[in-house]
Amino acid sequence: MGTLSDLDSLLGCMSRVVAATRHVVQEKVYLHFDNTGYFMGEKMWFTAYVVRADGHRPGVRSRVLYVELLNPGGDVVQRRKLKIDDRGHAHGDLSLDSLYGAGFYEVRAFTRYMSNWGGAACFSRVFPVFRAPSTPGAYEPVIDERSYRRRLPDFREPDTLHRSRLNVSFYPEGGRLVSGLRSRVAFQVSDGGGRHVSADGELLDGEGRVVGRGSSDSTGRGVFTVPASCDGLRFRLRDARGRFKEFPLPESSSEGCVLELPPSLDDSLRFSVRGTASYRDRLLGYMLMNYGRVWSCDTFRVGSGYHKSYLRDSLPEGVNQLTVFDGRGRILCERLFFLFPKPSASDTIRVTSETTRLTPCGKVRLRLHAVPGSVFSFSAMDGGTVFNGRGPSVKSWMLLSSEVKGYIEDVGYYFESDDSVHRRASDLLMLVQGWRRYDWEELSGYRSRNPEKWHPVEDMLYITGHLRSLKKSLPVDGIPIKVYVYSGGSYTDGEMLTDSAGRYAFSLPDVWGEWNLQLKAGVNKLKSRYLVTVDRRFGPPSRRLSPYECRSLPFLPSYLPLLPDTLEFDTLPLLSLSERLHKLPEVDVKAKHRFTEGARAAWATEKRGQYWADVYYDCDEETERYLDEGKEIPLFSDWFMERSEFVDLSHTPFYTGASGEMDSNPLEEAAVETGDMEKSLTSGKEHVEWGRYKGRPIVWILDNEYARGGGKMAIEVPLGERTKGSIAVDLFPLFLDEAKSVYITENPNASVAYHYPPYAEDVVTVFVYTHFSPRRRMEKGVRRTYFQGYNVPSTFEMPDYSLMPPMEDFRRTLYWNPDVRTDEKGEAIIEFYNNSSCREIQISAEGITPDGRCISNE
């Protein structure tokens, strides 16, 4: 029998959870984009909607939003830092003119506060980025033939599932199997590439008898029932080759409870809890939460089986979390379930055209209808150049995708209908991909989080970090830290003492763009024993993408009911691009400039490396990353091998570092070794190899001059006649911070201009660019770096054909407005000009109302 103390404990858990959900309010962000796919060289325009997770209303405390663009290998290639306004809105753009190769790029967005809950709490969407058209306007959806996964190191999170030709993952309803209790188990079947597999399976007991069956659908998901005796069970599947493969089920607990909430076919929702003998007479609790808000809770005894029913209409729509717990706040069983959100006419942005005919470069006037006082973003696209489906909407992201783990294929399907087929599908989705945005055991106090790993809310701009001592005996608390932030003629400074953990924090007024930052620790003679770190690497690790994200999405057209004026499209004269250019007159070169060091630096631009590059590394940013993390700057060769899994310099003459304490001078040791290398290069030695990339010899090009490396020669020539430039071995970067950038290409033609004769084997060319400065070392106890203020959003521009004649115009996004506002009647007028060839316009409008409703034109 339960006691008063049991009841008090359960009520205490409930009270702590209610208080925690009110105090620790999570945030969500959704990005609405101007298009569904892009071409290299374009801009990607977006509006961000940042809301409270408990109701999707504005009111977040964060004022800093981070938006990142990741290449197909998982590297961040572009980052934006945007200011969130009082409505929770921010807008900006990402430039696609400096990418190295087409492919599927990921955009993710998060606040620093969101990173406390990992990558699953952040926004993510994958876009195809196609090759730039060979001629203006000749858009073809072409992605590089070579797979990025084969030519780029993959820095995304490792796959936790050991892949074979057939894989099965099991998800017991409620979280675990319990011996002696019947329960449902969902499963996911996939192949070695992570693609869904439809298959029929059999559940076998320890003696090989069939005790159950289950089939996976087109999503690879299915469910079967485990009998009360669940020890030694195996699930058997037949693979595509007709061979059977068996998979053991997760180990079962000897004691505990199981939860069952099957998809109902009527207007009710029922769940049941069963427990082993030790739990049947105990007083337990259950709690129902909806997006972080406590909706219902109560105590109960399991007995021979506890049953509870609700009317579906009495429960909140969307994703709900049902938790069964004991008096300590420990979860006994838990699951998510999804209730179909009923559509409403007020959720729709209606678009009517006041233009009857679509003409080249002609004006288009639209009238938008939505809830009065709504604010949303709007895009008009050339339908003939849209090569990808629309992907997730603001509604599907806020109500579903943000509450589960992983990518949801065809997420719009779960918002189509509330029939039995869709209910079963959402039930399987919740069982397989359910993610606990709210960790109930943390909320109840059963398990605590390390406060030192907690990221604060950035309600303004901050500079934070910590002081790290290179010897444990040196103190880090109470050390004065001075900060100087300056740009041009503007500056600000401050000073504070570090706390007991060596941490510091400075707040800044709103600043825009990049500023110089200097941090100095007041440690005087001991400054060589301290490093000053900066917090700015708190983004989530790159996640492994689903193969279903890396393909074109199905089209869901939303074209305007406009008829193209065919006659005008065929007969209207247009100025060509060349006719619009103003050519400068030619000038005679009177004298040649002397080749100075500055001219050499100008000549050794990175355009050659950029032209050939498959892979690019920003060494300055890489150096900052090491310093931000409180690490010593590594040797260039050590960094290169760590950075790329394809690089092998282990058996080369590269200097690879000294063992033990760095009391000796590595520069002197490297100089001796460099002298030995130069002797070997000039002694007539047949072949010196300087590392391999994917098993192929590396040719090193330093500041556009041949430096070292290569493969065996196709023909024999004297050593001194082999290179077409000076051998710059002594100038090669020793430490990472001496290099500026690295470009890698597997094209065998890249090194031809630097070396004669051709190689007898395929080589990989690595272009290394330096700062043209003496070898430099960072001063200990002082950090000279940069501070990124808010990025200034660009302004979307379009021609005004009322002031100019029609001309060739190949805009794919005809119009983008991140801030459309309806009047008191709920109306807004949009006007823009068509391009020269668009015959059908596709539109996209999305937003979130102040009361948390997701609105769109879908």
Name each model feature, range by range.
Residues 7-32, 37-84, 116-117, 283:
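Contiguous segments within soluble domain cores/interaction surfaces
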Residues 70-71, 77, 220, 284-297, ...:
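Extended, solvent-exposed regions of the mature portions of secreted/cell-surface glycoproteins
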Residues 81-84, 212-218, 298-303, 494-499, ...:
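Short beta-strand segments within Ig-like beta-sandwich modules, predominantly Fibronectin type-III
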Residues 90-96:
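Ligand-binding face of N-terminal immunoglobulin V-set domains in extracellular IgSF glycoproteins
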